[in-house]
Amino acid sequence: MIGMLTGRVESVETDTALIDVGGVGYEVRMSATDLSRLHAGQDTRVFTYMNLSQDAITLHGFLDRDAKKTFLQLIKVSGIGPKVAQSLLSTLTPSQLAHAIADNDATALAKAPGLGKKGAQKIILELKGSIDLSQIEGASAQAATSKSPVDTGTEQVVEGLISLGWRQQDAQQAVAEACAENDIPTPLATDDVPRVLRLALALMDRGR
């Protein structure tokens, strides 16, 4: 089983990143949140989960151990597969997910594409009491102090798209794709923010 990849980002697509590890390219499915933090040419470390099915072998990737741990808990819930689990992580952070479960907030969970209210209620029923909030928040705080500085430029673009009525997940995917297609490095420079906003809007207007 492949538990972690360390290499260089070859490309970033709508829902995957291609990671070059010693000349071998691994296609890794990732959340929109994580993809927005990657760009071509960047060195990265990705924690992975290998999903084996009759049709394919799929690698799911996470930039933080905390996100992977949350993913593994989600796919233990009956009826929740890797695709929906990753959709949840594109919509809410691990800490937000944990709080939604602890607070019986099915509405917050149901915002994830592909889940629905019944699926959200099932997650709460099966996981409530099994998630340690203090552990998740402690890990998130530690990750925040050790990772690269916050990409405020990307945040500005995403917030701008949200203010225009787009969903957060779609906005994050559009920004990641715009940067990848036009070789725009991240974290975004202040001067690149207007350009990326225009490019992301153009992508979304084409039917993303």
Curated annotation (Swiss-Prot):
Record flagged with keyword Transmembrane: no
Span list, region Flexible linker: 143-151
KW Ribonucleoprotein (keyword) present: no
Keywords: Cytoplasm, DNA damage, DNA recombination, DNA repair, DNA-binding
Region (Domain I): 1-63
MF terms (GO), sorted A to Z: ATP binding; four-way junction DNA binding; four-way junction helicase activity
GO biological process, one term: DNA recombination
UniProt cross-references to InterPro entries, sorted A to Z: DNA_helicase_Holl-junc_RuvA_I, Hlx-hairpin-Hlx_DNA-bd_motif, NA-bd_OB-fold, RuvA, RuvA_2-like, RuvA_C, RuvA_C_sf
Domain of life: Bacteria
Region (Domain II): 64-142
Sequence segments annotated as region (Domain III): 151-208
Annotated signal peptide: none
UniProt protein name: Holliday junction branch migration complex subunit RuvA
